[in-house]
Amino acid sequence: MATSLSADSPQQLSSLSTQQTTLLLLFSVLAAVHLGQWLLRQWQRKPWSSPPGPFPWPLIGNAAAVGQASHLYFARLARRYGDVFQIRLGSCPVVVLNGESAIHQALVQQGSIFADRPPFASFRVVSGGRSLAFGHYSEHWKTQRRSAYSTMRAFSTRHPRSRGLLEGHALAEARELVAVLVRRCAGGAFLDPTQPVIVAVANVMSAVCFGCRYNHDDAEFLELLSHNEEFGRTVGAGSLVDVLPWLQLFPNPVRTTFRKFEQLNRNFSNFVLDKFLRHRESLVPGAAPRDMTDAFILSAEKKASGAPGDDSSGLDLEDVPATITDIFGASQDTLSTALLWLLILFTRYPDVQARVQAELDQVVGRDRLPCMSDQPNLPYVMAFLYESMRFSSFLPVTIPHATTANTFVLGYYIPKNTVVFVNQWSVNHDPAKWPNPEDFDPARFLDKDGFINKALASSVMIFSVGKRRCIGEELSKMLLFLFISILAHQCNFKANQNESSNMSFSYGLTIKPKSFRIHVSLRESMELLDNAVKKLQTEEGCK
């Protein structure tokens, strides 16, 4: 009996072991599948998954839905998907950031990771690929930016002498602008102020960059400045040129637009290159720089010489024209757009215009013109400027960014080399921060004592933040203050009653008011402006 049991036991044990192994293996596979499904569901529910977003259509993705007013489309999607979501433009995945928290976490807390630019075709066209604004983030780019920023400040806001020179340029162009506007409004006429405003602002930047100005009827200068809107449409968020490259393969409006874009960039670059070459030829060794172009050339030549004390942080000489192109091109377009907004808001809100004028009359008086030293004593004027920037959000979406590494924003995973759109408009129109954000109300920036609420003013997002923050922000705010203060002090602005009071816009990199007509009249006479300009050194016109 014992022998029999001993003989059968190995077979039984072997059979049992095989069955157990099979069952265990099957159970393990089922458990692994079940666990995998559970983990997948948990992963999808976790905040570190990819950002959500709308369904993308084949070939075009969500491009057809973006439309011209991309910032409004993004704001609508943010209400549905949250402040971080993903769309697809053609085959290009794009993460869109909305709201102060998401944008700050990305651009400020992770500035270097979000500082790159996408490899878009249009970006490579600007300044032959050497653009500071559109160039890739690198050590070379950081050197280029530091040099551009320090030189721009040296010729604008850093020193009392440079601030005085800039005020002089602004005063001279404000005087010329007033004369042109008033003359063209003679006999009660109305005019579109767009062209005179663009020329006035461009002349200030021409004086800073090149040491010269142009007449308001200079055909070559007007032609050069006439393509600002076309440029903005091509490089703005949602532009089809970059995200649907197959459209370049056959005749269509997008390809036509891109070829025009290439030509206008060549024209603009050649304009600046001519100024650069003339400056190099006429630059006197050892002499003080006459303007910003001189300063860049001197810095680059000092670096290239390799002599003791050379400026190793300066620009390379071949980068100088592209950097000046960026500074001159971006500043004159941004400033003219902002100033047009200030004028149209003056005419649409005459009570605001009257309050600005009353504060200027009380603080400055009628026997002199406003100047930068008056700024701290003009809180309502500054409130008007900040509210105009917030309300218009004339730079609604920044130039597209790209990531340099894998990262997370608000828990969502964003891979390296992802294209990122930053919706600044969403910050400026957040009802949680700005009660009734669609109302234009400069008083929202004043505290109970009538002073500027600096914390609120600093939260207006118009010049971006982080590594790509606009280097001309300080200069822009200074010039806008000078222009609008002098204009309001000297003139009255009246809307055309035959036009609709509703404002309409054109969209691109900036939001520009469409053509509008106003009447401009002197509050008194040109005497103050004429006398002030006579004290300035006469500037030699460009040849």
Swiss-Prot record:
Keywords tagged on the record: Endoplasmic reticulum, Fatty acid metabolism, Heme, Iron, Lipid metabolism, Lyase, Membrane, Metal-binding, Microsome, Mitochondrion, Monooxygenase, Oxidoreductase, Steroid metabolism
Pfam families in alphabetical order: p450
Any one biological process term the GO annotation gives: arachidonate metabolic process
Activity regulation statement: Enzyme activity is increased by cytochrome b5. Enzyme activity is increased by liposomes containing anionic phospholipids, phosphatidic acid and cardiolipin. Inhibited by naringenin with an IC(50) of 5 uM.
Annotated GO CC locations: endoplasmic reticulum membrane; mitochondrion
Topological category with respect to the lipid bilayer: Peripheral membrane protein
Tissue expression summary: Constitutively expressed in retinal and kidney pericytes cells. Expressed in retinal endothelial cells (at protein level). Expressed in cardiac, pulmonary and aortic endothelial cells. Constitutively expressed in trabecular meshwork of the eye (at protein level).
Disrupted gene: phenotype observed: Severe ocular drainage structure abnormalities, significant elevated intraocular pressure.
Compartments where located: Endoplasmic reticulum membrane; Microsome membrane; Mitochondrion
GO MF annotations, alphabetized: estrogen 16-alpha-hydroxylase activity; estrogen 2-hydroxylase activity; heme binding; hydroperoxy icosatetraenoate dehydratase activity; iron ion binding; monooxygenase activity; oxidoreductase activity, acting on paired donors, with incorporation or reduction of molecular oxygen, reduced flavin or flavoprotein as one donor, and incorporation of one atom of oxygen; testosterone 6-beta-hydroxylase activity
InterPro entries, alphabetized: Cyt_P450, Cyt_P450_CS, Cyt_P450_E_grp-I, Cyt_P450_sf
PROSITE patterns assigned to the protein according to its UniProt record, in alphabetical order: CYTOCHROME_P450
Annotated residues for binding of heme: C470
SUPFAM superfamilies xrefs: Cytochrome P450
Induction: Up-regulated by polycyclic aromatic hydrocarbons (PAH) and 2,3,7,8-tetrachlorodibenzo-p-dioxin (TCDD).
CC cofactor: heme
Entry's EC annotation: 1.14.14.1, 4.2.1.152
Pathway in which the depicted protein is active: Steroid hormone biosynthesis; Cofactor metabolism; retinol metabolism; Lipid metabolism; arachidonate metabolism
Reaction(s) the record says it catalyses: an organic molecule + reduced [NADPH--hemoprotein reductase] + O2 = an alcohol + oxidized [NADPH--hemoprotein reductase] + H2O + H(+); 17beta-estradiol + reduced [NADPH--hemoprotein reductase] + O2 = 2-hydroxy-17beta-estradiol + oxidized [NADPH--hemoprotein reductase] + H2O + H(+); 17beta-estradiol + reduced [NADPH--hemoprotein reductase] + O2 = 4-hydroxy-17beta-estradiol + oxidized [NADPH--hemoprotein reductase] + H2O + H(+); estrone + reduced [NADPH--hemoprotein reductase] + O2 = 2-hydroxyestrone + oxidized [NADPH--hemoprotein reductase] + H2O + H(+)
Function: A cytochrome P450 monooxygenase involved in the metabolism of various endogenous substrates, including fatty acids, steroid hormones and vitamins. Mechanistically, uses molecular oxygen inserting one oxygen atom into a substrate, and reducing the second into a water molecule, with two electrons provided by NADPH via cytochrome P450 reductase (NADPH--hemoprotein reductase). Exhibits catalytic activity for the formation of hydroxyestrogens from 17beta-estradiol (E2), namely 2- and 4-hydroxy E2. Metabolizes testosterone and progesterone to B or D ring hydroxylated metabolites.
Family the UniProt entry places it in: Belongs to the cytochrome P450 family.
Protein name as catalogued: Cytochrome P450 1B1
Organism: Mus musculus
